[in-house]
Swiss-Prot record:
One of its GO terms (biological process) is arginyl-tRNA aminoacylation. The gene is glyS. HAMAP family: Gly_tRNA_synth_beta. Belongs to the class-II aminoacyl-tRNA synthetase family. It comes from Salmonella schwarzengrund (strain CVM19633). It is found in: Cytoplasm. InterPro entries: DALR_anticod-bd, Gly-tRNA-synth_bsu, Gly-tRNA-synth_heterodimer. GO terms for molecular function: arginine-tRNA ligase activity; ATP binding; glycine-tRNA ligase activity. GO terms for cellular component: cytosol. This is Glycine--tRNA ligase beta subunit.
Length: 689
C-alpha cells in the first residue's frame, strides 16, 4: 500500500496567543485519534502553529484503509426457521441488515450449536474520501470557549478563516472546511516575503513558508529562537533576561518572524519598586526585563518585533516612547501613595464589598486580624506582629499603585510598610499573604507570614462555604480550591501543628451570625480533604493509598502527610499484601457480626494455639506502639505491625472464627476487632489493592 505525506493548514486572522499551543496540540491529538479510529496507517503527526495559522503534517499516511473481512453472526438455526423451515422474522430482519436474503447466508457450526452467518470482503475507503470529514471533526472538537461568526456565513470558529490547504502528496484533496474551499494556496507574513503563494507538495512544508513567506511555522523553533536571541541580547549589556515560561509562550504566539531588540528607560525610574516596573513591562507591553548578576533591575528591556526593519532604531525608539508614560505613572503613584501611612487607608476598606452577605473588606480585615493572631499563638509565631499584619493586610488595595497595577497587590503593601517603619516580618507577610498563588509557588517565608496567609484563605473558605456557595463543576469564582490547597501546603511543608477542625471552627466563629450553613465546618474540612486527594495523586501516590488514609479522616494536615508516607512505605514491605488481604477479611467478618463484642479479649476463653499466639502478639504490640501513635511515628508502627503476618496467617489457617459456642465466637471476633483497631490507628489498609 502506497504512503504519502499529508498536510492541512488552516489560515486565519490572529489567533488568541494564550490559547495557540493548546489549539494546535488538541488539533493534532484529535486528528491522530480520527486516523487511528479509521484504521489509516500513518507515521508521525507533527503540529505547527503561528499567529495566523494552525497546521498538521502527517508522515507516511496510507492512501486508503486496508481491506477487511467482516463476519456477522445471526440467530441460531433453531430460532431462524419455523417448524416448516420458513425463515423467522428475526432471521429476515438480520438478513436485511446485512443486505442479503436468508438463503444467501452461510452456516456457522460449533460444539455449542449452529447459527446463520454473513461473511463479506469490505474494500477500504480512500484517504482522500475520509480526510475532509476527519479534519472538520477535529476542528469542531477544539477547546474554544467562545466561537466567532464572520461575514454573512453561518460558520463558527475561534477566528475568521481565509485559507484551507489540504494536500496528500502533491494532490489537493477537494473539500469545504469552515466554509472555505480547499486549495494549495498559503499566505505568508503580513509585511515581509510573498503575501500569497502555492505549495506543490506537502513535503515542502514548513520550509517553503520559511523561505517564501517569512513565517517560522514551527512553534517550538520560534520560541527557542526568541529565548536564545534574548539571552544573547541580555549578555551584550551585561545582564540576564527575565524569560519566564508563560511570557515566552505568549510572545512566541504573537509573532511569525521574531526579531529581538534591546531598549532602555531612564534610570530615575529605578527608584520605584522593581515589581511595579516589571508589571508594566511584562504584563502590559510583553517586554522581558533585564537584571544584573546581583538580581537588581537594569534600566533596559528586551522586546520582540514581528518584522525585520531596515532601521531598527525606529522600532526601538517607538517602544521606549510607549513604555515611558507607564513608568512615569508608576513613579507618580509611588510618590503619592507614600504621603500616607498604610494604616490611613483602613477607613476606605469599609467602602469596598468583599461579598454581599459577608460584608466589606474592612469586615474581612477585622476577621483576618483576629484569626492571624489566633493562628500565631498555635504555631509559636509573634502574636502582636501577626495581628498587626492582619490589620494592614488589605490596606494596599486602596493605594493608587495597586488600583492601577492590580498584580502589585501585596508586594506594594510590603514596600509601603517598610517605608512606614513596620517590623520586617510584618512587611514581608503583607507580600506573602497570597502565597502560594499557583502549584509549585513559594510558600510564606516566616511564621507571621504563614499565620496571615492561612488566616486570609481560611476566612474566605469559611465565609463562602458558610453561605452555601461552594465550587460547582469548573466554576470557582473565589478560587477556593487554590485557597484550600495553599493552606494544606503551608501546614504540611512547614510542619505546623494546626488542626483543620479547630482552625475552621475559629474562622467560622469570627463571622458571628452571618453564616447560614449549619454544616460549614464539616463542609470545609471535607472539601480540604478532597484537595488532599488531588494533591497526593499529583505527587504520584496511588488512589487506594489515599483512600486508606482518608478513611480515618485525619484533620491535622501534617499528621495526614505522615500517615500517607507511612502507608506508601508499608506497601513496599513483603508482608503488606497478605496483611491488607487479612484486614479486608477481618473487616468483612466484623461487618457481618450481629452480636455485641467484649471490651477485652478474655485469655481464659482462648483455646487454639494460633489464637493464643495472635492474642499474645497483640498485647505486646499494643503496649509497644502507643508511644509511636502518640508521636505520629506511623511508618515505624506499620513496620512493627508487619510482624503480625505469620500469626494472622496461622490464625485464619487453624481457627474457626464463627465457632458454635457463643463465648468462644464472641471472644474470637473481639480478638479480630482488636487486630483491626491497631491498624486503624494509622489507616484502613483493608482498602489497599
Amino acid at each position: 500500500m502506497s504512503e504519502k505525506t499529508f498536510l492541512v493548514e488552516i489560515g486565519t486572522e490572529e489567533l488568541p496567543p494564550k490559547a495557540l499551543r493548546s489549539l494546535a496540540e488538541s488539533f493534532a491529538a484529535n486528528f491522530t485519534a480520527e486516523l487511528d479510529n479509521a484504521g489509516l496507517a500513518h507515521g508521525n503527526v507533527e503540529w505547527f502553529a503561528a499567529p495566523r495559522r494552525l497546521a498538521l503534517k502527517v508522515a507516511n499516511l496510507a492512501e486508503s484503509q486496508p481491506d477487511r473481512e467482516v463476519e456477522k453472526r445471526g440467530p441460531a438455526i433453531a430460532q431462524a426457521f419455523d417448524a416448516e423451515g420458513k425463515p423467522s422474522k428475526a432471521a429476515e430482519g438480520w438478513a436485511r441488515g446485512c443486505g442479503i436474503t436468508v438463503d444467501q447466508a452461510e452456516r456457522l457450526k460449533t460444539d455449542k450449536g449452529e447459527w446463520l452467518l454473513y461473511r463479506a470482503h469490505v474494500k477500504g475507503e480512500s484517504t482522500e474520501a475520509l480526510v475532509p470529514n476527519m479534519v472538520a471533526t477535529s476542528l469542531a472538537k477544539l477547546p474554544i470557549p467562545k466561537l466567532m461568526r464572520w461575514g454573512a456565513s453561518d460558520v463558527h470558529f475561534v477566528r475568521p478563516v481565509h485559507t484551507v490547504t489540504l494536500l496528500l502528496g502533491d494532490k489537493v484533496i477537494p473539500a469545504t472546511i469552515l466554509g472555505i474551499q480547499s486549495d494549495r494556496v498559503i499566505r505568508g507574513h503580513r509585511f515581509m516575503g510573498e503575501p500569497e503563494f502555492t505549495i506543490d507538495n506537502a513535503d515542502q512544508y514548513p520550509q517553503i513558508l520559511l523561505e517564501r513567506g517569512k513565517v517560522i511555522a514551527d512553534y517550538e523553533a520560534r520560541k527557542a529562537k526568541i529565548k536564545a536571541d534574548a539571552e544573547e541580547a541580555a549578555r551584550k549589556i551585561g545582564g540576564n533576561a527575565d524569560l519566564s515560561e508563560s511570557l515566552l509562550e505568549e510572545v512566541a504566539s504573537l509573532v511569525e518572524w521574531p526579531v529581538v531588540l534591546t531598549a532602555k528607560f531612564e534610570e530615575k525610574f529605578l527608584a520605584v519598586p522593581a515589581e511595579a516596573l516589571v508589571y508594566t513591562m511584562k504584563g502590559d507591553q510583553k517586554y522581558f526585563p533585564v537584571y544584573d548578576n546581583a538580581g537588581k533591575l537594569l534600566p533596559n528591556f528586551i522586546f520582540v518585533a514581528n518584522i525585520e526593519s531596515k532601521d531598527p532604531t525606529q522600532i526601538i525608539s517607538g517602544n521606549e516612547k510607549v513604555v515611558r508614560p507607564r513608568l512615569a505613572d508608576a513613579e507618580f503613584f509611588f510618590n503619592t501613595d507614600r504621603k500616607k501611612r498604610l494604616e490611613d487607608h483602613l477607613p476606605r476598606l469599609q467602602t469596598v464589598l468583599f461579598q454581599q452577605q459577608l460584608g466589606t473588606l474592612r469586615d474581612k480585615t477585622d476577621r483576618i486580624q483576629a484569626l492571624a493572631g489566633w493562628i500565631a499563638g498555635q504555631i509559636g509565631a509573634d502574636v502582636n506582629h501577626a495581628t498587626r499584619a492582619g490589620l494592614l493586610s488589605k490596606c494596599d488595595l486602596m493605594t493608587n499603585m495597586v488600583f492601577e497595577f492590580t498584580d502589585t497587590q501585596g508586594v506594594m503593601g510590603m514596600h509601603y510598610a517598610r517605608h512606614d517603619g513596620e517590623a520586617e516580618d510584618v512587611a514581608v507577610a503583607l507580600n506573602e499573604q497570597y502565597q502560594p498563588r499557583f502549584a509549585g509557588d513559594d510558600l510564606p517565608s516566616n511564621p507571621v507570614a504563614c499565620a496571615l496567609a492561612i488566616a486570609d484563605k481560611m476566612d474566605t473558605l469559611a465565609g463562602i462555604f458558610g453561605i452555601g456557595q461552594h465550587p460547582k463543576g469548573d466554576k470557582d469564582p473565589f478560587a477556593l480550591r487554590r485557597a484550600a490547597l495553599g493552606v494544606l501546603r503551608i501546614i504540611v511543608e512547614k510542619n505546623l501543628n494546626l488542626d483543620l477542625q479547630t482552625l475552621t471552627e475559629e474562622a467560622a466563629r469570627l463571622y458571628g451570625d452571618k453564616l447560614t450553613n449549619a454544616n460549614v465546618v464539616d463542609d470545609v474540612i471535607d472539601f480540604m480533604l478532597g484537595r488532599f486527594r488531588a494533591w497526593y495523586q499529583d505527587e504520584g501516590y496511588t488512589v487506594d493509598t489515599i483512600q486508606a488514609v482518608l478513611a480515618r479522616r485525619p484533620t491535622r494536615p501534617a499528621d495526614f502527610d505522615a500517615r500517607m508516607k507511612a502507608v506508601s512505605h508499608f506497601r513496599t514491605l513483603e508482608e503488606a499484601s497478605a496483611l491488607a488481604a487479612a484486614n479486608k477479611r477481618v473487616s468483612n467478618i466484623l461487618a457481618k457480626a450481629t452480636e455485641p463484642l467484649n471490651d477485652i479479649v478474655h485469655a481464659s476463653v482462648l483455646k487454639e494455639a494460633a489464637e493464643i499466639e495472635l492474642a499474645r502478639h497483640l498485647v505486646v504490640l499494643r503496649d509497644k506502639l502507643q508511644p509511636y501513635f502518640a508521636d505520629g511515628r506511623y511508618q515505624e508502627a506499620l513496620i512493627e505491625l508487619a510482624a503480625l503476618r505469620a500469626p494472622v496467617d496461622e490464625f485464619f489457617e487453624n481457627v474457626m472464627v464463627n465457632a458454635e459456642e457463643k463465648d468462644i465466637r464472641i471472644n474470637r471476633l473481639t480478638l479480630l476487632s482488636k487486630l483491626r483497631e491497631l491498624f486503624l490507628q494509622v489507616a484502613d489498609i483493608s482498602l489497599l489493592q
